[in-house]
Regions:
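Alpha-helical/coil-rich non-catalytic "connector" segments in signaling and regulatory proteins
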Residues: 1-114
Length: 116
């Protein structure tokens, strides 16, 4: 039986995440997780991965919509962003792109990624 995005968000601590966009993509299959903080993240991603990030690399990206398109093409199943240290909030450009791409985008509450 495949594990889906809608399944992993029922598990703590992901159950504390807030869905920002891409609700229609919650049936995407999850194979593994990846934590990345580099601008060219798509070269490190595999189909079915869930991407976790604190947004450090977003400061170097001019077009966050294009970033979302690249990771969606790489086959990412969902994106979890942890605002706080590098971002005050998930940028609107990412939210709009995720909705258009049907790519689930979540905001994580204040917690360490080690708990994932």
């Amino acid at each position: 039986m495949d594990l889906l995005v809608q399944d992993i968000i029922k598990l703590y601590p992901l159950s504390r995440a807030r869905l920002l966009a891409g609700k229609s993509g919650l049936m995407r299959t999850v194979a593994s997780a990846n934590i990345q903080e580099v601008p060219n993240v798509e070269r490190w991603l595999r189909r079915g991965e869930v991407l976790f990030t604190a947004g450090y690399a977003f400061r170097e990206l001019e077009d966050l919509g294009a970033f979302m398109e690249r990771i969606e093409r790489a086959g990412v199943s969902a994106v979890f962003v942890k605002p706080g240290q590098y971002l005050q909030a998930v940028p609107r450009e990412m939210i709009d792109a995720a909705e258009r791409l049907k790519l689930p985008l979540f905001s994580l509450p204040e917690l360490s990624l080690i708990h994932i």
